[in-house]
């Protein structure tokens, strides 16, 4: 395999020019994008694409790239899609890299583009409809070349998928620094993104797509499991969801976690998905047990709630059709409801109108974008009306941070809470009601990848994590709300292996706090050093975390001091991670709620067993979590204030400004 992967070090293949492989008919493809470029902007898009190639090839490639631009709305450079090796995460020793740190990044990039992992692998999109690793295949080849030849005295800078080059640094510096979608704030609209992406100058990195840290749908299963468990506790007053019905939408890279999480919680889950390919993939991976395209047949399974057995069902069709049918079916009780359509990208494949077929929608969004937008907004109004009707009958609904409430309000749906000047919705975001408190305790989606590719190494890390949680929860003075987190996470890691969550690299996610993350990293590093693990481990996290993301409609929606629209936390986080030991860092515009609606960042840290990497892990993880807790404490969150005070007691060098609390009576007594 080393010989096969040796081509990664050669860069863009143009001597000789490879034959065009065509589109792979065995994988789904991104829908075409509407072209909103002027003639001069089109010319610039072609010129920008050709600069990756010698002048002798320009006359050959220019027409080809123009055809791609006109047909797909973007230049992917399909001719250069690699076909002589399988795109997947290979064991780290098989990568032709001088730096093992760089080799670990190559592994993570290829995992993000694995056909079993990525949503649209030919278009370099990992999840979310437009969450891109690169803008085109030339960038992929050039990046892999740089990573192959770099040393630990260099840093690769990535500008929205484009490898700007290798720059001298030192061993303590990050090997790669990634930015995606960074634009001047006044130019951060959907239209700006569409124009700049078509021109090849920016991309939407989503979260872990553009930071090379995606681990398949498992990456959100644990968080979804926690959300559902706590929704049951908060809304239904139950500790178990056995016999409860949960309805939502989406079986994509992130949303696909819903069926698995609901099954783990014991619920009956019905998820609608319009893409036949997405349904087929999740069914083949056993993340969905049953598939229906006829709602009458599906509802004939209504007795399953009485059987008290967990069940995951996919409805292949539009979620609004499902919701409206549920309104008609008075005998079916829906206990919990949400939505995970990709409404950060509402008019280009993230949300499909109920009035026409999946195929017709893909045509309309390119050829008749104005009509398509009108149909989407009408569908959003119907969607909201149906949810309101079921909520009136007792269903508890929440926004899953996908901009559903925001886009429904823009469509003039009945979604605004009266008396709030249009600033609040009648339904909560799940961060406001559930995950915000968990983040404020310092718990978030920590994850790791075993670079050996050996499932036995993953089993060992699961055992290490389980034993560590047992140790942490048995210590004296653990607050009750923290104890509950430990208990939920212990159950998760105890059962993770049997739930067969791995898709792609040998990876695991585990919600953990600052102490837990640091101790896990140290334990993994020592296990590599003493040979318990056969190869290094890469640790990371979702950007959707305690400190990683500023997003007023999701991660910071429970910030109460008016700073939910400020991005200082996410920016400070990535800067702080970079000089405290991260192997690579990333900062993005967008994330799950849309371009211009969030700033989010992440990191990767390579653990090879050395003392230096242990020190880096301790230093960086302490900052990576406590930064967000400090910010949340300053914005009047009691959980965060108590958590940061405990952190300061444990570490005398940590000194955080604590707010003085003002009496509401005093404020209200002022003569405004």
UniProtKB/Swiss-Prot annotation:
Recorded GO MF terms: urocanate hydratase activity
Catalytic activity annotation: 4-imidazolone-5-propanoate = trans-urocanate + H2O
GO biological process, one term: L-histidine catabolic process to glutamate and formate
Binding of NAD(+), residues: 128-129, 206, 253-255, 273, 318-319, 340-344, 351-352, 400, 592
Pathway given in the UniProt record: Amino-acid degradation; L-histidine degradation into L-glutamate; N-formimidoyl-L-glutamate from L-histidine: step 2/3
Enzyme Commission number(s) of this protein: 4.2.1.49
Cofactors that this protein relies on: NAD(+)
Top-level class of the enzyme under EC nomenclature: lyase
Keyword Membrane assigned: no
Family membership noted in the UniProt record: Belongs to the urocanase family.
Name of the protein this chain belongs to: Probable urocanate hydratase
């Amino acid at each position: 395999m080393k010989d096969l992967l040796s081509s990664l070090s050669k860069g863009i293949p143009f001597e000789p020019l490879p034959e065009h492989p065509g589109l792979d008919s065995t994988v789904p493809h991104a829908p075409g994008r509407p072209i909103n470029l002027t003639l001069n902007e089109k010319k610039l898009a072609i010129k920008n694409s050709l600069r990756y190639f010698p002048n002798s090839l320009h006359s050959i490639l220019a027409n080809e790239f123009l055809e791609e631009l006109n047909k797909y709305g973007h230049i992917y450079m399909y001719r250069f899609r690699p076909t002589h090796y399988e795109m997947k995460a290979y064991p780290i020793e098989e990568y032709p890299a001088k730096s093992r740190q760089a080799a670990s990044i190559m592994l993570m990039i290829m995992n993000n583009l694995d056909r079993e992992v990525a949503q649209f692998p030919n278009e370099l999109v990992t999840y979310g409809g437009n969450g891109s690793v690169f803008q085109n295949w030339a960038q992929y080849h050039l990046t892999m070349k740089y990573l192959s030849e770099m040393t630990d005295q260099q840093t690769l800078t990535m500008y929205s998928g484009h490898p700007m080059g290798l720059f001298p640094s030192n061993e303590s510096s990050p090997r790669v620094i990634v930015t995606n979608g960074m634009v001047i704030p006044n130019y951060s609209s959907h239209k700006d993104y569409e124009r700049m992406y078509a021109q090849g100058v920016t991309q939407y990195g989503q979260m872990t797509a553009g930071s090379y840290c995606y681990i398949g749908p498992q990456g959100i299963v644990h968080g979804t499991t926690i959300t559902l468990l706590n929704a049951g506790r908060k809304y239904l007053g139950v500790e178990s969801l056995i016999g409860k019905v949960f309805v939502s939408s989406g079986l994509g890279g992130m949303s696909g976690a819903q069926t698995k999480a609901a099954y783990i919680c014991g619920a009956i889950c019905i998820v609608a998905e319009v893409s036949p390919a997405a349904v087929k993939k999740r069914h083949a991976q056993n993340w969905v047990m049953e598939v229906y395209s006829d709602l009458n047949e599906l509802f004939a399974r209504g007795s399953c709630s009485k059987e008290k057995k967990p069940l995951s069902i996919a409805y292949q069709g539009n979620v609004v059709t499902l919701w409206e049918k549920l309104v008609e079916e008075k005998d079916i009780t829906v206990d919990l409801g949400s939505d995970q359509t990709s409404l950060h990208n509402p008019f280009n494949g993230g949300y499909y109108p109920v009035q026409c077929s999946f195929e017709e929608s893909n045509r309309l969004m390119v050829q008749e974008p104005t009509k398509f937008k009108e149909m989407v907004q009408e569908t959003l109004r119907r969607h909201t009306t149906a949810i309101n009707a079921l909520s009136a009958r007792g269903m508890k609904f929440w926004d899953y941070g996908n901009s559903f409430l925001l886009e429904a309000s823009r469509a003039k749906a009945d979604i605004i809470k009266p008396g709030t000047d249009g600033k609040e919705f009648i339904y909560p975001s799940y961060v406001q009601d559930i995950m915000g408190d968990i983040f404020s305790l310092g718990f978030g989606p920590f994850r790791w990848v075993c670079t050996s590719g050996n499932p036995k190494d993953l089993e060992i890390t699961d055992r290490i994590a389980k034993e560590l949680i047992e140790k942490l929860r048995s210590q004296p003075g653990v607050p009750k709300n923290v104890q509950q987190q430990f208990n939920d996470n212990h159950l998760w890691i105890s059962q993770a292996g049997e739930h067969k969550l791995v898709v792609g690299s040998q990876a695991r996610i585990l919600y953990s706090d600052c102490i837990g993350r640091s101790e896990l990293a140290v334990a993994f590093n020592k296990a590599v050093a003493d040979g318990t693990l056969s190869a290094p481990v890469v640790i990371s996290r979702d950007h959707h975390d305690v400190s990683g993301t500023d997003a007023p409609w999701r991660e910071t929606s429970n910030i109460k001091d008016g700073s939910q629209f400020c991005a200082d936390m996410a920016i400070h986080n990535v800067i702080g991670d970079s000089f405290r030991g991260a192997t690579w860092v990333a900062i993005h515009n967008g994330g799950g709620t849309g371009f211009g609606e969030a700033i989010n960042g992440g990191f990767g840290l390579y653990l090879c067993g050395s003392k230096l990497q242990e020190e880096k892990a301790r230093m960086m993880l302490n900052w990576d979590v406590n930064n967000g807790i400090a910010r949340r404490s300053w914005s009047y969150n009691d959980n965060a204030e108590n958590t940061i005070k405990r952190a300061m007691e444990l570490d005398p060098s940590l000194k955080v400004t604590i707010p003085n609390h003002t009496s509401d009576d005093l404020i209200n007594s002022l003569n405004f």
